[in-house]
A protein has these predicted regions:
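Soluble ligand-binding/transfer domains with enclosed cavities or grooves
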Residues: 2-191
Length: 191
């Protein structure tokens, strides 16, 4: 009986691994696929994140590839790059929305936040400043940012996490699916 129970676990782990691979491929190549929501729901139920063991996996630059929102800036678009940088060890986060292609460095919106991991899945977010962010010229980052007075609590519940994929739910209930962009390094938070 134990042998069969172990086989079931192996089959389930294999199925979960294939589901993750399929979802990651769809997010990269077909982000408007109708199959994404079903795969997201399956992974959230069967493979919950645990930030007490996965904090290093959370750290890095993530690209939004799908969301349950109808807002255009929260939808994947070929001409728009939507990044989220999380550095929980430094307590910092950054959202970047910019045009794709070579002009993207001149037309970006940046929102900086303080973040803190408060449970096995929850990351509290306190937005601090936001505005236009341009290129770095002569070692100086060109930007025009204003302070933000956040009047509501914000958080992300990280529901699925591995080295390449993150699924989370925001405080407004929106579900996000992001892929890791390891080639985009963490920023110098002092600039």
């Amino acid at each position: 009986m134990d042998r069969h129970a172990n086989m079931g676990v192996l089959i389930d782990e294999g199925t979960l691994a294939q589901t993750r691979i399929t979802l990651a491929e769809l997010l990269r190549n077909e982000p408007s696929s109708d199959k994404i929501f079903e795969l997201v729901q399956q992974l959230v139920q069967e493979q919950p994140a645990d930030l007490s063991d996965q904090l290093d996996q959370l750290t890095g630059t993530w690209e939004l590839r799908w969301s349950s929102s109808s807002q255009p800036w929260l939808k994947q678009s070929p001409g728009l790059l939507n990044l989220q940088i999380l550095d929980p060890n430094q307590g910092r986060g950054r959202n970047i929305l910019q045009l794709g292609g070579p002009l993207g460095q001149f037309a970006g919106i940046q929102v900086d936040a303080d973040i803190s991991v408060v449970s096995q899945q929850r990351v509290n977010v306190c937005f601090k400043r936001g505005g236009w962010a341009g290129p770095t010229v002569a070692g100086r980052k060109l930007q025009l940012l204003r302070s933000i007075e956040q009047s509501f609590p914000a958080w992300l519940d990280i529901t699925v996490l591995d080295d390449a994929l993150r699924i989370c739910r925001g405080n407004a209930g929106t579900i996000f699916a992001l892929v890791k962009r390891p080639e985009i390094r963490l920023p110098d938070w002092t600039l």
